A protein has these predicted regions:
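Glycine-rich phosphate-binding loops of nucleotide-dependent enzymes
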Residues: 1-267
Length: 267
């Protein structure tokens, strides 16, 4: 399979300097396996940049994403989206501030499987399709048809329940919902897990197009090749900490592999 790469969609040499990025400072998140699943993590993602996180699963990546998304409490530290502190903001407020989130488990976190495709496409944003407290079904249907066409969701029937679609098309619903609106920062956690080659290439192209449009993107993937192909910078996360951060153009599997199991990295 030929992966879409950061160069193949016209990446610039340096990220854009305008727009809204993400700044995480000294973030600590508690957990079950360790006292600190995320341990004093700090980073910045500028507009027009993809920061990829590599690492063996279970080293705090999921907890980091969930904390930024508002799904897990923060013990200490801060999260800023542009000039706005969203550390204690609700999920809806983060969403309205321009934070999008592709969760790692589409069926558990991303979709309501019994809901229709149309209802899943506006999940969490129903208040934008409401008039006097009543959902505007015509507006939802029109929006759903546009998103189905734009993101090539098959079959193109907004009234089907999400469970009736293939895994790849279920993932496209999530991607369409989170990337088909105005957003500043995207959290993409295992965005191509369990989907076919065609869907992988489509999702990669959408992520890179968003980066080129000036969005800041945090990518987490268990597929090291995916992280290497899409990222502008790569951080390795081990036992809740970033143990190395480097430009993706300088990174190799041979360099990153040892860091993923806690060994020192030669740079």
């Amino acid at each position: 399979m030929r992966l879409t790469t950061r160069e193949s969609v016209g990446a610039s040499a340096a990220p854009a300097s305008t727009g809204t990025g993400l700044v995480v400072s000294n973030l600590v998140v508690g957990g079950v396996r360790r006292t600190r699943e995320v341990d004093e993590v700090s980073f910045e993602i500028r507009p027009g940049e993809i920061l990829g996180i590599a690492g063996v699963e279970g080293n705090g990546q999921s907890e980091l994403i969930e904390a930024i998304a508002g799904l897990r409490p923060v013990a200490s530290g801060s999260i800023r989206l542009g000039s706005r502190d969203i550390t204690s903001a609700s999920v809806r407020d983060r969403h309205d501030a321009g934070l999008s989130h592709i969760p790692e488990d589409r069926q558990r976190r991303g979709l309501v499987m019994e809901y229709t495709v149309a209802d899943n496409l506006v999940l969490g944003a129903q208040h934008h399709f409401s008039r006097n407290g009543t959902l505007d079904r015509a507006a939802i249907a029109e929006y759903a048809q546009r998103q189905i066409a734009a993101f090539d969701i098959r079959p193109p029937n907004p009234l089907l329940p999400a469970r009736a679609l293939s895994g790849g098309n279920q993932q496209k619903i999530v991607v369409a919902r989170e990337m088909g609106r105005d957003f500043h920062v995207l959290l993409a956690s295992q965005p191509t897990r369990g989907v076919d080659v065609g869907a992988i290439e489509f999702i990669h192209a959408q992520i890179l197009a968003a980066r080129d449009a000036g969005r800041a993107i945090l990518l987490v993937s268990a597929e090291l090749n995916e992280v290497l192909s899409l990222s502008d910078r790569i951080a390795v996360m081990y036992r809740g900490r970033f143990v190395t951060v480097m430009p993706a153009a300088e990174a190799t599997e041979e360099q990153l592999g040892p860091a993923m199991i806690g060994a020192e990295v030669a740079v």
